[in-house]
Amino acid sequence: MGFYLELIKTLFQAVGDDGKLRNRVVAFTAAGPGEGVTYVVNLIAKELALQTNKRVLRIDAAALRELHLADANYVARYCEETEVENLLAISTTKAKAQTLTRGVSRANDFDSNPDYRLACIKALRWNFDYVLIDCSSLAVSQDATTLATLVDGISVVVKAGQTRSAQIKRSQKMIENADGKFLGFVLNQRRYPVPNWIYQRL
């Protein structure tokens, strides 16, 4: 847990030259499936809410695609409460129900309409102090690269003993090629000393 508390301090509480928080909206992804992105996002979101007492949202990137809102400014209306008072979530289940109610058009399609994507992220920034977006792995989805220019940065979850160095470095390159800000690696299920080259990015 100490590792994640340090991550919160160095990543989410970092302040820019203008005195404002640098990383309020952060996406998390992985090089491949099974790295534990959802586990890490849930854990960090909970600790972030508890440690800062700020309003935190945990959202699945798939839910953003499935909401199809008539007005993106109302995205926060579809939040669900969690066991932590100041931590909210938007699930794919809630999003699918909204899709059935409202229907889909090009104007409110997250994948095809960049203006709608931007409006959704702006609305989340307005309603929450921190937003953590759970993206599928880079091997199976374009979630992270689609969001790359809209979020403050992207962190890559690395599962101890599973992810190869070449995969990890390739994922960093994919984010940077999408004009995203690579924030570093988050090691999940650590069982042995962390390689120095990973720590250098955190």
Provide a role label for each language-model segment.
Residues 1-2, 13, 18-25, 29-35, ...:
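P-loop/Walker-type NTP enzyme "switch/lid" segment
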Residues 3-8:
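Phosphate/oxyanion-binding active-site loops and adjacent basic polyanion-contact surfaces
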Residues 36, 65-69, 164, 192-195:
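Short, charged/polar "capping" segments at the starts of alpha-helices
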Residues 40:
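Hydrophobic positions on the alpha1 helix immediately C-terminal to the Walker A/P-loop
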Residues 43, 47:
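Active-site signature of alpha/beta-hydrolase-fold catalytic machinery across serine-
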Residues 49-50, 148:
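Gly/Ala-rich phosphate-binding loop of Rossmann-like dinucleotide-binding domains
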Residues 50-56, 178-183:
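Structural alpha-beta junctions
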Residues 112-202:
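Conserved catalytic-core segment of NTP-binding enzymes
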